[in-house]
Amino acid sequence: MLKTIIFDFDGTIGNTQQIILRSMQATIKEMGLPERTDCQCAAMIGLPLTQCFTNLYPDYSETIVDEEKGALCAATYRRLFDEFNEPGTVPLFPHVPETIKALHQKGIELTIASSRSHQTLDAYVRDLQLGEYIQYILGVEDVKDAKPGPGPVLKTLKEFRRLPEECIVVGDTKYDIQMAHNAGVKAVGVTYGNGSRKEMEEENTEWIIDDFAEMIDVCNSFL
């Protein structure tokens, strides 16, 4: 029986793509790095920030961003993101509020594991009025083996004393699916975020949904 759901936030619950891309492009410009397209930047969403920039400028690129410079990019990104992040900038995806409420009423433990900071997750959960339903939050600084590693899932399982077969991960990118599978947990991929159906299929995702409301059907399949 399903006991616990671990949700990604960006691209799964909150529609943050535009502010993320704006912040990444502004960071690239401020740091004097070669241009990258929005598509290239979007492909990094879901990774820890430093890794986003080291992956955008790898060893074979015209400009290399190592770990040290990647950390500087990450700090610049956070500052710019905070500047751009005005109230109402990040909406929930369709059917998230009522579906989250319905899942909570079923007695399922609802949690979030994200590559963004714990502080910003707390703020979004509060501002988007999800605090009544979300029982546990993990940001990138809360775990050692961050997404796509299994760290966030394993820590959540330990917190709630659950087995892998009692939990699912819900996310919009291959990194979410890899995190789930690396921890021995099944995954739900959403197609409306930053990833694609093809990406989910390539990761052998157990369920692929086009609308958050379909989470009710996924959960019912466990009963």
PLM regions with names:
Residues 2-97, 104-106:
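N-terminal helical cap/lid subdomain that shapes the substrate entry/recognition surface
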Residues 92, 113, 145:
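Residue-level marker of regulatory loop/turn positions in helix-turn-helix DNA-binding domains and
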Residues 1-5, 101-104, 117-118, 123-223:
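Asp-based, Mg2+/Mn2+-dependent phosphohydrolase catalytic module
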Residues 12, 114-116:
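Conserved phosphate-coupling serine/threonine residues in phosphotransfer and NTP-handling enzymes
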